[in-house]
């Protein structure tokens, strides 16, 4: 009988963006791959896809019906492994798999960044920490992507459960690679930028946590010192109008580009001079790693995810959250020192290779194998 795995997350785009290599790996192993998530995105390597309207808010009453749908799917298909991602998807899937787990289904959860962390609001600790502590009883393996979360997870895990740390979800270092000056210029022309523009790129959803406000304020401080500065936001989100209004208010509209969704994000990164990130909370910082893979120097806010990949002054710079002036100073420093840009970029590429897709697939294969090689299902309490 063919073995089956169910991947669950809040939205299906999460899988398209980050998990296709793992789907492919399971197919190569002869497994059936099923997906449960909100959305209509077509996903390769998937045998069954369940469009389940999981809500992002843990307080949305519709998630009760979602729980019932998920439980029906899990109980019907008798999965060997259920691997869940994202906070709400992870909660609902683990609750829905409790009965199946008693019959041998193994449940894995990847925390892409706990909402409770150093510096997080007290409400995050009061809400998310007790829930994760409770759910650890229904989790066979808790997987983390940064050191702070790994240490925290070891304190959460119940006897019999495993805690693992991997090098993120994997950067495609072939797609995100350095390009020649000629190719960079071609990409700039293709995407509507000038040859002499000094381009900073930040691919991220426009929201409060990604904190684009700090970058806009930094750009406003540099608008006269670096007239060719272009700060490019690749993404959409609820804060787009607010951030556009802020750029206008600070007189920086000519220097801030709201690019919107970009299907060729690797090209937007390759045409840039510097990779930037201003998030308050980050699990790892894939956008920073993608910039590093393309040999872009990185400037990012000092949080647990960015600290995992940036060594201040060696492969990039870390900036205190909220300190727009410090961000501006580092941008200006790189503008005036192209040799420093090259040095940081080369070191960044070395860092990105340690977080490559090939390495993380290998790490996850080791984790999965512990549950795939069982001849008979071992029942969980």
UniProtKB/Swiss-Prot annotation:
Q: Which GO terms describe its molecular function?
A: glycosyltransferase activity
Question: Which EC numbers does the record give?
Answer: 2.4.-.-
Which cysteines link up through disulfide bonds? Answer: none
Entry superkingdom: Bacteria
GO biological-process terms attached to the record: polysaccharide biosynthetic process
What induces or represses its expression, per the UniProt entry?
A: Repressed by SinR.
Q: Which PANTHER family match?
A: SULFOQUINOVOSYL TRANSFERASE SQD2
Entry similarity comment = Belongs to the glycosyltransferase group 1 family. Glycosyltransferase 4 subfamily.
Name of protein:
Putative glycosyltransferase EpsD
Origin organism of this chain? Answer: Bacillus subtilis (strain 168)
